[in-house]
Amino acid sequence: MPRYKTVEQVLSLMKDRTRVRNIGIIAHVDHGKTTTSDTLLAASGIISPKVAGEALALDYLNVEQQRGITVKAANISLYHEAEGKGYVINLIDTPGHVDFSGRVTRSLRVLDGSIVVVDAVEGIMTQTETVLRQSLEERVRPILFINKVDRLVKELKLSPQEMLNRLLDIIRQVNNLIDMYGEPEFKEKWMINPQAGNVIFGSAKDKWGFSLPMAQKKGINMKNVIDAYTASDKSKLEELAAQAPINEALLDAAIKFVPNPIEAQKYRIPKIWKGDLDNELAKAMLNADPNGPIVFMITDMKVDPHAGLVATGRVFSGTLRSGEELWLVNAKTSQRILQVSLYMGPTRELAEEIPAGNIAAVLGLDRARSGETAISVGFSNVQGSFERLHYISEPVVTIAVEPKNPKDLTKMIDALRKLSIEDPNLVVKINEETGEYLLSGMGFLHLEVSLQLLRENYGIDVVTTPPIVVYRESIRAKSQVFEGKSPNKHNKFYLSVEPLNDKTIELISNGTIREDMDSKEMAKILRDEASWDYDEAKRIIAIDENVNVFVDLTSGVQHLREVMDTVLQGFRLAMKEGPLAHEPIRGVKVILHDAVIHEDPAHRGPAQIYPAVRNSIFAGFLTSRPTLLEPIQKLDIRVPADLIGNVTAVITRKRGKILDVSQIANMSRITAEIPVSESYDMASELRGSTGGRAFWGTEFSRWAPVPDSILLDVVTKIRERKGLPKELPKVEDFLS
């Protein structure tokens, strides 16, 4: 099928929203997502069927092909016919490695359905559970694809009955997760049911797959599969692939079970749009109206060396055309579209227009970032935007980078800026004291891949420090009220600090409590769910990005309103670098009880207010049993039962603790937690102690206090590394 024909077909079909499906492929690392995508691409004539499965067309970064894992969420529009009708399938391949789960979160926002790929031997792994939970939270309907069924025959040598039991076991586990994380109105309908056909069994590498209804129609059963793999030549396997092509099985299921944008947006918009559902924008989105105002949700920014920044996202309403002016809600500016296109893997194909319900790539919006909402410029005064994306992990590992060749410094700074635009989970900052460029990421692999991208895409070789784990500072007790004076002694602030309880931290972290909420609504939730005093909760006036809260309990203080913005800026700055080790503060409630403000604006500028606010917060902090929090990783390890002892020995040696051990078939599953600081050589140790027979997944679990026995040692090391005085600051240092 010639390629241009497909692009034409895709563009004309995009206008009929009942013929559009937006689906993603999600899974644990190495369970076969990208291979699955390739096989689908081959079927629509985009890559040659001979190399599908090895082409890794969607893994178009060199890094991805070498490591065999997907780093970026790539997307592509496919054409597929089912029951005599043509359909457009917008397909997004998402990374499965936990270090890149930020990209998964962004992709899910634009999908209506997901193909969950599970390895038949390894079963449900941590990352499968995480992405499935995320997709159910975003109201994305799952279809199950049990991949690598050949391993049950070739490696485990199971009989047809044993194979069936194994597959049913995986289906049961997926349904348990849907039951646990799905919303009540969708649970029943979205359950995986082999008879209905929303589970596919197959092997993406060998290009065959079928659902039960398809197998019955074509007269295939598990015995045919076993025969295909036990036969002496490949002809039976090729026959199986011809009789039950995987692309037909998966895409037919997607068309049948994934809702079209008109159906999906009716129930997804109320979940992901925060704003009035009665205004014109929301109404247009609820109906996926191509003639309404434009609402374009941007989930990905890529740097194209020839064209500049390309914004990719979903058109929830309206129709994108070049020349159209859009208002960027977060950037608070308007920009004009220069070009509209759709992605066919790494290449962009130009389009005159892309209507609601589709995925589009746009040039001209270079002020946008991932998570931006772009709307028709005439609606800039209408309140609302998409709910903030919740990333499952936080950057927890940092390295300092400098170019090997000092002449490359400006080039490196520019490249780092571009990388951080493409990947919002990569944080780039300059250490003011040492002038070092610091790169923070979700894990060791995330940073390694970023450095490889620097080398390959921008030609910059860098020298790096060994990875440093990022800590947070916090407190464990309530302080008294301290007075903070401004340097000119004309302004005074009376502040105290106390730790936030776990429930409050959870509500802020998962986005239930937001700074921009109605104060009464916020107070009601905090009172009912986190035991706050209602009146105190109503007076929260700021929440920063590290889950700290500022409460204003003053009444009738003269001139306070005029300087309140400066006070809050002082609070945010103080929270960025705590007194213990200049690490960010987390989980602290700062209460302003009273203040004295000078009447003359000349005497109450930022240079006076910032130190006064900071000093009283820090004095309180140091008297409240301060501590450091370290990032903890959750491990999910599968290992033959006789090697459990070897694995637990490695974990306990690394200050880890075992949470659970269970038996699945002939493997044991160990769930454990271990500090990120101890995980640096974890992979090689696990491999060494199990002779390479353990496979595992990791994900960020939580922040936990560093044990008191090593606290001082850790603080001293961080202070030394940052060039700070060895001795810790005292309360008196902040009280002048």
Swiss-Prot record:
The modification Diphthamide is found at H603. SUPFAM superfamilies: EF-G C-terminal domain-like, P-loop containing nucleoside triphosphate hydrolases, Ribosomal protein S5 domain 2-like, Translation proteins. GTP binds at residues 27-34, 93-97, 147-150. It is found in: Cytoplasm. Pfam families: EFG_C (PF00679), EFG_III (PF14492), EFG_IV (PF03764), GTP_EFTU (PF00009), GTP_EFTU_D2 (PF03144). Residues 18-234 form the tr-type G domain. The keyword Oxidoreductase does not apply. Gene3D superfamilies: 3.30.230.10, 3.30.70.240, Elongation Factor G (Translational Gtpase), domain 3, P-loop containing nucleotide triphosphate hydrolases, Translation factors. GO terms for molecular function: GTP binding; GTPase activity; translation elongation factor activity. One of its GO terms (biological process) is translational elongation. InterPro entries: EFG_II, EFG_III/V, EFG_V-like, EFTu-like_2, G_TR_CS, P-loop_NTPase, Ribosomal_Su5_D2-typ_SF, Ribsml_uS5_D2-typ_fold_subgr. One of its GO terms (cellular component) is ribonucleoprotein complex. PROSITE patterns: G_TR_1, G_TR_2. Its main location: cytoplasm. Transmembrane segments: none annotated. Keywords: Cytoplasm, Elongation factor, GTP-binding, Nucleotide-binding, Protein biosynthesis. The keyword Nucleotide-binding applies. Catalyzes the GTP-dependent ribosomal translocation step during translation elongation. During this step, the ribosome changes from the pre-translocational (PRE) to the post-translocational (POST) state as the newly formed A-site-bound peptidyl-tRNA and P-site-bound deacylated tRNA move to the P and E sites, respectively. Catalyzes the coordinated movement of the two tRNA molecules, the mRNA and conformational changes in the ribosome. Belongs to the TRAFAC class translation factor GTPase superfamily. Classic translation factor GTPase family. EF-G/EF-2 subfamily. This is Elongation factor 2. It comes from Saccharolobus solfataricus (strain ATCC 35092 / DSM 1617 / JCM 11322 / P2).
